């Protein structure tokens, strides 16, 4: 689950991260670098067979994240467009910003680095076609490529 908040210059991410990690449903929580000093973005990775709901309230304003068990699902192979793996920092944030309208997100790789990921496709052909569309953009980053992994795993 990717959370993006704007206008939160004094947001206490460390406290929130600690609170989220207290749940047995959580696999990982990590911050995404955002090129706006009044915004914050972070990812909450859920363990297998966990589902969620998010509710937003006002007066007072807050969000509620509910986590619960869901029916066991068989992991499947998924395809996606991605950048190379790198440290979480400004270069990664710049790639994510370029592809913001394609719902790009930063994901942690198996080796602890990070990658920008775009889309989720059921076949390599479908992902290749989407990558070809991106290649026609003027701002295309030529380091993107199609990759795959099991739906319950992080990419390589």
Residue ranges, per PLM feature:
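Extracytoplasmic
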Residues: 88-114, 120-156
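Signal-peptide-cleaved, periplasmic/extracellular N-terminal interaction regions immediately downstream
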Residues: 1-99, 103-111
